[in-house]
Amino acid sequence: MNLEQLYDVIVVGGGHAGTEAALAAARLGVKTLLLTHNIDLLGQMSCNPAIGGIGKGHLVKEIDALDGAMAKAADQAGIQFRILNASKGPAVRATRAQADRVLYRKAIRTQLQSQANLTIFQQAVDDLKIEGGLVTGVVTQMGLTLKARAVVLTVGTFLGGKIHVGMNQYAGGRAGDPPSIALSKSLRDLDLPVGRLKTGTPPRIDRRTIDFSQMVEQPGDTPVPVFSYLGTASDHPQQVSCHITHTTEATHDIIRNNLDKSPMYAGVIEGVGPRYCPSIEDKIVRFADKTSHQIFVEPEGLTTEEIYPNGISTSLPFEVQVQFVRTIKGFENAHITRPGYAIEYDYFDPRGLTSFLQTKAIPNLFFAGQINGTTGYEEAAAQGIIAGMNAALQIKGQDLWCPRRDEAYIGVLIDDLITCGTQEPYRMFTSRAEYRLLLREDNADLRLTEKGRQLGLVGDERWDSFSKKREAIESTQALLHNSWVRVHHNDLFKEALLNPMQHDCRAAEFLKRPEINYRHLLMMDDLNLPELPQEITEQIEIQNKYAGYIDRQQQEIEKLRKHENTMLPETLDYNDVVGLSSEVIQKLNRIKPTSLAQAGRISGVTPAALSLLLVHLKKSRLPV
């Protein structure tokens, strides 16, 4: 590589945020350098070998709609696929894939190495070069200075990382990898608001020492789902089952009797852990009335004997881990191949970021992933694609972009972070979105792919496939709205109809009946409806069956759009707004919301405060 090369964008970190950031920047045509401490670990799944789940699967679909890497890699590495909440409404259905770690890394690396405008270099970063309030490059561990017009930091749990097993602790970014101590210090010297968070991982078990006969088998779905809109089931490797087991009262007794050896309960760990992925110690303390907890026994891959016991994350001493693991059903003779541990790391208050994930202090420095206080591969990847894209757009002198809350779960994620901050690792759920009927997994491409194409993120293959799908949906919907189902068709549908038709109706109206699907309409030769793939007929059915609810949410969004379009100047000093409480003034001055709607989402900012802001804007003749 040319050390004198001026890169447009340097991405630091090769995890899920970093790989999406680097690919996004390169797709936009700017010269991009991805720096990682180990090229062999690009796209490494540091904890659970799985992609997707409730809320998370929605993010993966949105990343895919923007031509990101995660869904394609999950399809190529997924060894079990399931649709969660399949019996519930379409808003909360979510895809989840158990993944082979090795195949996932391979899939990500293949995408990185085949991407134009992208160079990969193995070096840890120790420092940033700052001149005139802008970042001008990075300094690596071996003293190389690499110049850049923008930098994206995606450093995961490596900043000041400290690993805990019982009362023993040592520096580490994850087991077997060194932390970024020098970079952590450099960032702290920039006076950015910093905190500490904690996460953990369970011990790994040798599959050959497990008695699966005591467990419940959990096979994947048939037909096997896919993650990517461009994917097919033929992309998947061999499919395998997971299993379910449970802790016992003996497990709980051992853990209770050893809580004094837990670094969390002994006060050794300062960082706050993830609320929705608690350690087994936390579960037993917080849910003391429960006599057992469920454990998902998940394979780590097709070429390894290691098993991931999802549900027993722990930082207890290794000898205690051995004791309690062997009280779990089917684990009586278990051999632990790797101990569980907790890891503490630095994160920076995301309220110091704009919605484009650039730091307010240094506008060409972008943060994505766990550095912003999130947890999870999917949350990291979603931030990565936005940060990398915006770094490239900034270089090109184009308007930066982030989806709104009503456009994508990515928008919900980023708005939550920059508006409310987080005191604990942030995880996405469907319940965080106000408009989740609009933000479904099945329509992520309809929501985002056209915008991705306009921005330069979406390539020709995806655009051609999407355009054909959208045309098929629109033309078929037009047919349904202009075709009639007659009363005499009652006989044709007598096996399906809960109540016979009393009058003729349009086919689109007939499809709203819960017992009727698109296949029923194909029975009517005079409609001349086309045979369509399942993903298209599903979209048509949802759009018709939920039309009233969807219209209602659209109306709510239009009402709120006025506040979204009421911009608040960055230079506005909220001390000048008459009538605001000191708490509201303090929060508004710190966060500097960009719109009246964002101000309203800040904790403690009341409707009365928003009215005062509107009055102030009008009095000051500021644009409203």
Swiss-Prot record:
GO terms for molecular function: flavin adenine dinucleotide binding. InterPro entries: FAD/NAD-bd_sf, GIDA_C_N, MnmG, MnmG-rel, MnmG-rel_CS, MnmG_C, MnmG_C_subdom, MnmG_C_subdom_sf. GO terms for cellular component: cytosol. Keywords: Cytoplasm, FAD, Flavoprotein, NAD, tRNA processing. One of its GO terms (biological process) is tRNA wobble uridine modification. NAD(+) binds at residues 273-287. FAD binds at G13, G14, G15, H16, A17, G18, V125, S180, Q370. Belongs to the MnmG family. Homodimer. Heterotetramer of two MnmE and two MnmG subunits. NAD-binding protein involved in the addition of a carboxymethylaminomethyl (cmnm) group at the wobble position (U34) of certain tRNAs, forming tRNA-cmnm(5)s(2)U34. This is tRNA uridine 5-carboxymethylaminomethyl modification enzyme MnmG. The gene is mnmG.
